[in-house]
Amino acid sequence: MENNDIQFTSLQMRTDKYGWASIQYTNKKQAILYTRNGGVEWDVVNPLNSIVLFAYPINARSSWAYGLTKTNDDLLPAIFYTVNRGERWSEFILPVEEEWEKSTDVQVQLHATNMDSIWIVLSRKLASNKFEHNLYYLKTKGKAWKVIKNISISDSISGITFINDLVGFISLQKQYETSTVFKTINGGESWQAIKDIPSLEGINTGTAMAYKAIYKNKLLVIPTKMNDDKFLMNYSFDKGNSWHISNKTINTSKVAVSFFSSYYGWVINSENGSVYQIIKKGSKWIKVSSNPLIKNVFCLHFFNRRKGWACNKKEIFNTKDRGITWKKVVYKINNIDKLV
């Protein structure tokens, strides 16, 4: 398989040397990649006898993945995890009951902050153009599943984030009828639309997209793109009870976002390569550079105050100076023919 046949779907370097990436190849399948030399070489580290649909790294050694595991000539939905850089994977079979959940066409959203528990949303689009979503929660130490079937949201989910066992947020791409963000305070049993986010007040037409919520040191951030290609941030400092809008907006249809901590975040305008550093818990945006080299990037991850990585579908870039300068990283993927 040639590199032309693959495209990056995510990139998360965790140190200067070690990191994870995901690529998509034929038939929507994903491969999980790992590097030990700063992104120069990547190894395919998929779980054996599996079809990977979604990867979710936690740190330099550990990652979750969702996919289908081949068991007795059957394909069963499973959550995989590794704590040794993908050298070995363990798996838990999801207690699914419906045939559509066993498909490679299922839409998947994951959220985890450690290797002790993980949230999984499986979704499908119905003939009515509405969506059906089933929510799974796994606590690995007890190997106990909590299953919430057909949660009360009918729009397309763009991300799920839990800030503790009970409080969580689902971000949507939808019409402005109520809200693009739903909140639970009972571990996903019920969800309520957040109606007082300031960026959405007074708007009745068009489509908005809320990105997956980011939670860092009590700062809750929901990046939001409005229907008029205006990008902004919604912030909360009290677990989503009250909200503040960023004092900066960007006119763009494409962005990449990363927060290293509650004090340091970045946004790239992927239409023109402008880079903004966000400080003071979101209150101050500083334009640090504009570089056409990083136009079209969609993934962005800073692992400290100065060093970050970005990717578009085919290329990888890194910065060592807060996003002021960027360098293209020449890479190769070892044994990529194994994916055929």
Question: Can you name each region flagged by the protein language model?
Answer:
Residues M1-V340:
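Extracellular glycan-interacting surfaces
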